[in-house]
Amino acid sequence: MAFHSLLLLCLAGLVFLSEAGPVAHGAEDSKCPLMVKVLDSVRGSPAVNVDVKVFKKTEEQTWELFASGKTNNNGEIHELTSDDQFGEGLYKVEFDTVSYWKTFGISPFHEYADVVFTANDAGHRHYTIAAQLSPFSFSTTAVVSNPKD
């Protein structure tokens, strides 16, 4: 049983590493400063139809909804915002994990998986936030790159 779990985890990791990288900025996605990628560790596939909300921290120290979307068949969301709108600040990406797992009849431990990060404090950048989900754990990583003209 432990070997089977380890094998599934390794396979999911391979999928994560092979598909989680950003689309080459400067190609079709050059105006996409924030991209989200979600993978299902249990099934070893992209997590389709995951609701994602992006919040920005206000001067009053509250979270204001900034953008939202649902992952596509590749487990990705592009065009959440534009270069002009995505300014310096503190952002929170919220993955609605409970709704995703309940579609498969699974009652997960986490209601949401949140990633809080500071954006564009060292100049304009493009961000890919990748999340790997399972019912009782999640892992996130980010790829930060300079945009190409």
Swiss-Prot record:
The modification Sulfocysteine is found at C32. It is found in: Secreted. Keywords: Gamma-carboxyglutamic acid, Hormone, Secreted, Signal, Sulfation, Thyroid hormone, Transport. Residues 1-20 form the signal peptide. SMART domains: TR_THY. It holds the Pfam family Transthyretin. InterPro entries: Thyroxine_BS, Transthyretin/HIU_hydrolase, Transthyretin/HIU_hydrolase_d, Transthyretin/HIU_hydrolase_sf, Transthyretin_CS. GO terms for cellular component: extracellular space. Sulfonation of the reactive cysteine Cys-32 enhances the stability of the native conformation of TTR, avoiding misassembly of the protein leading to amyloid formation. Highly expressed in the choroid plexus. The modification 4-carboxyglutamate is found at E64. GO terms for molecular function: hormone activity; thyroid hormone binding. PANTHER family: TRANSTHYRETIN, URICASE AND TRANSTHYRETIN-RELATED. Homotetramer. Dimer of dimers. In the homotetramer, subunits assemble around a central channel that can accommodate two ligand molecules. Interacts with RBP4. Thyroid hormone-binding protein. Probably transports thyroxine from the bloodstream to the brain. This is Transthyretin. The lineage of its organism: Eukaryota, Metazoa, Chordata, Craniata, Vertebrata.
